[in-house]
Amino acid sequence: MKHKLISAKVIADSISPEGVRMTTMEIEYPRFILAELNTHRMLSKNSASSRAIPVKAMHDFIRANPATPVHWGKNQPGMKAKEELTGPESKNAVFIWNQAKEDALHWADALAHKLAVHKQIANRITEPWMTMKTVISGTEWTNFFHLRNHPDAQPEIKALAEAMTVAYTTHLPVQLKPGEWHLPYITTATYVPTGELQYFDENFNRLDVEDAKIISASCCAQVSYRKNDPTFEKAFRLWEQLIENDPVHASPIEHQATPMDISSMCRFEPETWQPGVTHVSANSDLWSGNLRGWIQHRKLIQNEAVW
């Protein structure tokens, strides 16, 4: 079932010569299910941030797009509400939910504009009514779909998983070779005479692969404040702030990846592994961070994590 504030679209979809699919989606959903989404650690995520979006902008967005439950379940023992409120009870529940939203907006505004409290605090009051935008990438989707597209899941995350399942199963991935990059928010095309994969910005200006990776990372990072400026200038400013700074904030570079050159490596001889390969699993698959069969951009960056 479709819901107004819950959506999913594929923005990059690739498959390696070994048949491992790497998919990136842009999803929208109520913030109150973010914790459930974040339990799926095999998927990389960047999301809109209460710390990054100004209070007034956040309040304007909440008033235009308030998050609401998709199923007003009656109270009962356990985690699943099977019976739904109807008639006056349902209308009253919606009224109380919306009144609580107005109260929260009032007090958050008082903190921010009367006491000059920072947005990272003031925005917390209104989080139940926020909708989230997230960029999510990975090679391991089966368990997410199995758990969340299920009758026992909370209705809102079930609706999200349904939308994501449809997006995933109806989209065809593009075949990539080692050295060719999966890059969200970057347009790609194969130059037929040479077979070379080429990269382009939103104005179809050609990019070299390193610039394309930086712009892709910038666009993934900008989800934090619900904007998308794909220009060189913005990309390189953000790259300096996030990647060339200390500490490195590397989550936006988890969405870019290239297929592993499996034929060049011996799985149980780490000295033969490509840069970026991090481990081998018990079933002999090679991994780069949370990506199977793909080299994750993050794992090619010095000091991407402190151990």
Mark where each language-model region is:
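A conserved ligand/cofactor-binding region detector
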Residues: M1-W307
